[in-house]
């Protein structure tokens, strides 16, 4: 067992970079929040990925949150390389609110990021973006929480993905000292 697999399942995202004819979409699991104030997120991308070069060139990217309905597109985005894969995907690229990089209409949410830092760690570059705007489907979020009926995707390994169950677990009451 490879040690990194011990950290799965991880949420799956689509990273959009570039614009116009240079737009690309890739699947990524290695995405996380790195700061609340200012709100920043990070994504690890290998230098051989086409998206890596577009983020370096345009200094911005969009993190799109796919649902189970988008699994085919997630798979294409994660297994094909270069912009020609967009012809196979059934997504609609729409203008973002604050960036030149487009967002994905079918996504549960789109988080628009302006690149503020990048560092190489081993075989990946860690791109940190400050969130400058966002959009989301109203049916996918309620009361400031994800609506699990929207079927957010998580990647377990290889071709296996799961969604989150509707049952919410809460810890038993813990009394503070």
Regions found by a protein language model. Name each.
Residues 1-177:
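Basic, polyanion-binding surface patches
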């Amino acid at each position: 067992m490879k040690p990194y697999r011990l950290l799965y399942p991880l949420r799956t995202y689509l990273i959009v970079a570039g614009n116009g004819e240079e737009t690309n979409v890739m699947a990524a699991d290695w995405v996380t929040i790195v700061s609340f104030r200012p709100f920043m997120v990070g994504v690890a991308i290998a230098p051989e990925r086409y998206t890596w070069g577009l983020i370096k060139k345009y200094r911005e990217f969009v993190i799109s949150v796919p649902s189970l309905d988008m699994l085919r597109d997630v798979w294409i985005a994660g297994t094909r390389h270069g912009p020609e894969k967009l012809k196979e995907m059934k997504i609609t690229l729409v203008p973002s609110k604050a960036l030149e990089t487009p967002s994905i209409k079918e996504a549960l949410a789109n988080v628009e990021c302006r690149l503020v830092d990048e560092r190489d760690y081993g075989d990946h570059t860690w791109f940190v973006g400050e969130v400058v705007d966002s959009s989301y489907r109203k049916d996918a979020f309620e009361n400031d929480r994800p609506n699990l009926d929207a079927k957010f995707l998580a990647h377990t390994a290889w071709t296996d993905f799961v969604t989150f169950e509707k049952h919410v677990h809460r810890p038993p009451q813990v009394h503070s000292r």
